[in-house]
Amino acid sequence: MSQQGISLDLDLQIAVDNPRLPTQAEFETWVRAAIGQTKPVVELTIRIVDIAESQQLNSTYRGKDKPTNVLSFPFEAPPEVELPLLGDLVICAPVVEQEAIEQNKPLIAHWAHMVIHGSLHLLGYDHIIDEEADEMESLETQLVEGLGFDNPYKEA
């Protein structure tokens, strides 16, 4: 199955006034890259938010009272229930923009990285333990470079 063979239902919610957001098609391309061959049918929501909403969600769900670039909320169904729902990503547009500036990266490349990073979290990847972090970063780098962008972890 190719990436294009994946049935993707992406609910893109824009809750911030920002004319420099990626297109629906770009978000779909990045999700498809991250999902790869793992699932033939996928449903997920990506919500683009402002600083206040990101900070509130980060405080509520992670105990960190500050905004963050991406939050991942995997859908957890009982083992006997098979649903294509992968989960939700919440991405803070102002944080992504600021990070791109600080890291001297093209904004579109950083958006791609954040969508891939969040999607991998929805698939169960994590970066709390060094070994898992290395695996996740390696996969992120491979996927981002496969889309024609530079290694997101390379020092600018």
From Swiss-Prot:
Gene3D superfamilies: Metalloproteases ('zincins'), catalytic domain. The keyword Nuclease applies. Zn(2+) binds at H117, H121, H127. Binds 1 zinc ion. Its EC number is 3.1.-.-. InterPro entries: MetalPrtase_cat_dom_sf_prd (IPR023091), YbeY (IPR002036), YbeY_CS (IPR020549). Its cofactor is Zn(2+). Keywords: Cytoplasm, Endonuclease, Hydrolase, Metal-binding, Nuclease, Ribosome biogenesis, rRNA processing, Zinc. It is an enzyme of class 3 (hydrolase). One of its GO terms (cellular component) is cytoplasm. It comes from the Bacteria. It is found in: Cytoplasm. GO terms for biological process: rRNA processing. HAMAP family: Endoribonucl_YbeY. Belongs to the endoribonuclease YbeY family. Single strand-specific metallo-endoribonuclease involved in late-stage 70S ribosome quality control and in maturation of the 3' terminus of the 16S rRNA. This is Endoribonuclease YbeY. The lineage of its organism: Bacteria, Pseudomonadati, Pseudomonadota, Gammaproteobacteria, Alteromonadales. The gene is ybeY.
